[in-house]
Each structure stands twice: as structure tokens, then as C-alpha cells.
Regions:
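Active/binding-pocket-proximal capping segment
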Residues: 117-123, 141-150
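Juxtamembrane boundary at the C-terminal end of a transmembrane helix
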Residues: 186-192
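Interfacial loop-to-transmembrane junctions
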Residues: 161-180
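Transmembrane alpha-helical segments of integral membrane proteins
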Residues: 149-163
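Loop-to-transmembrane alpha-helix initiation sites
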Residues: 2-13, 135-147, 170-175
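Small-residue-rich segments of transmembrane alpha-helices in multi-pass membrane proteins
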Residues: 1, 117-131, 175-184
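Generic multipass alpha-helical transmembrane bundles of integral membrane proteins
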Residues: 1-115, 128-134
Length: 192
């Protein structure tokens, strides 16, 4: 049963990070690029604003529902993965919630931001508390890791006021690393 939850958590976390692209492809909002001189200088075709608005609303609604579903799935799986005999379940939860939190940088609507950040923050805090309780031998390294992550987050978001290209690249690299770590961690948690 634990193997199913580990696999489902990994798939949900990976799907959660691919949701914007999936919803954009379902919304079918496209740009027609001109390929010849005649197409460049031709008058543009009229745009049906009502259809574009409806497609945007459809894609945005699907994205919101998807984010809520992924957050709910991860929050339900978190106590089950923390109760495993190996601390890899807690690491999977932390990495999945951290990837969700880093993915929230690309959210532009308030309701999606509230859902994603609050679910990721709640998941990180609850995972930390539960893993310290279930695996007390890892309490000090986990606490130090979480403090370092919190310090880095505060420095990159509040101390450097201007948008820093370095901070953006570091966050992109951290998000990519989290996504890439999920399958090997799930494999190790299943096999150990």
C-alpha cells in the first residue's frame, strides 16, 4: 500500500509542475506567425475576443482545479509517507512541496497564489513536524536544512528588493532539481 502512495505522490507532484503547460495546450490559445512577406504585410484577421476570453477562462479554471487537486493529494499523502520506516517518505514530501512553492513564482492570480503557497507552506511545516516526531534521529539535520532554506527564501525575496536575474536563475535551478529528484527518491523509498 505504501508503494502506491509513494508512486501517486510522485506522479501528482510531477503533474502539478506540468499543469500550466497542460492547461495552456487545452485552452488552445495560439499565435499565428507570418512566414512570407505577403503574410507580414497583409492585414491581420479579425480577432474574436469573446472566444479568446472564453478559452482563457477555461484554461484558468482548469489550472485552478488542478492546483487544488494536487495540493489536496499531497496533503493527504503526507502523513502516510511520513509514517514509513525510512525517512525517504518525508524527503519526498519536502521535495514535492518545495517544488510546488517554487512553481508559485509563475502564478499571477490571487486565488491560485493563495491556494498554492498556503498548501505548500502548510505541507512543509507539517512534514517537518511529523518527520521530527517519526524520525527523531534526523531532527537536527532537518531543522538546520529548513532554517537554511528559510534564510535563503527571505534573502532572495525580501532583502534583494529589485528583481535579480541571479535569484531567478537560482530558483529555476532549485525547482528543476526538485522535479528531477522526485523519481529517484520514489524509487529508493519503494525499494528500501
Amino acid at each position: 500500500m505504501a508503494n502506491i502512495w509513494i508512486s501517486a505522490t510522485m506522479v501528482a507532484a510531477l503533474a502539478g509542475n506540468a499543469l500550466p503547460w497542460m492547461c495552456l495546450s487545452f485552452a488552445r490559445i495560439s499565435v499565428q506567425s507570418p512566414h512570407s512577406d505577403a503574410e507580414i504585410f497583409a492585414l491581420p484577421e479579425p480577432i474574436d475576443y469573446a472566444e479568446v476570453k472564453q478559452r482563457y477562462i477555461t484554461g484558468s479554471t482548469m489550472l485552478f482545479i488542478g492546483r487544488v487537486s494536487v495540493a489536496t493529494m499531497l496533503l493527504i499523502a503526507m502523513p502516510l509517507l511520513n509514517s514509513l520506516s525510512t525517512p525517504l517518505g518525508a524527503v519526498i514530501c519536502l521535495v514535492a512541496f518545495l517544488a510546488m512553492l517554487l512553481d508559485s513564482r509563475q502564478i499571477h492570480t490571487l486565488r491560485e497564489m493563495c491556494v498554492t503557497v498556503s498548501a505548500a507552506g502548510l505541507g512543509i511545516i507539517c512534514t517537518g513536524l511529523m518527520s521530527v516526531r517519526m524520525h527523531p534521529e534526523f531532527s537536527i539535520p532537518l531543522t538546520m536544512l529548513m532554517l537554511c532554506c528559510a534564510l535563503a527564501t527571505i534573502v532572495f525575496t525580501h532583502v534583494t528588493r529589485r528583481r535579480s536575474l541571479f535569484a531567478t536563475r537560482m530558483a529555476d535551478a532549485a525547482e528543476t532539481l526538485c522535479i528531477m529528484m522526485l523519481p529517484p527518491l520514489a524509487y529508493l523509498a519503494i525499494t528500501l
